[in-house]
Swiss-Prot record:
Protein's UniProt name: Small ribosomal subunit protein bS16
Keyword 4Fe-4S: no
Species of origin: Cupriavidus pinatubonensis (strain JMP 134 / LMG 1197) (Cupriavidus necator (strain JMP 134))
HAMAP family documented for this protein: Ribosomal_bS16
Pfam families, per the entry: Ribosomal_S16
Lineage: Bacteria, Pseudomonadati, Pseudomonadota, Betaproteobacteria, Burkholderiales
GO cellular component, one term: small ribosomal subunit
SUPFAM superfamilies documented for this protein: Ribosomal protein S16
Amino acid sequence: MVVIRLARGGSKKRPFFNIVATDSRNRRDGRFIERVGFYNPLASEGEEGLRVVADRLAYWQGVGAQLSPTVARLVKQNAAKAAA
């Protein structure tokens, strides 16, 4: 099953996450099919903290990919922020 989840990057104490479409059997930071965005929890005011390629996210959901709970929360917050 294909899932869309966070893959951790960055250095120690400086997390950075790629939002990736991957097979659920792969490791968290292992092989992935496609990178559909990123999340930087330590982004300052001038930096972009979250970027999601909406059409690719919609494509993967259309072919049956499941969002992880954290990615679903981030996408929902981003949509609310964009609408406001």
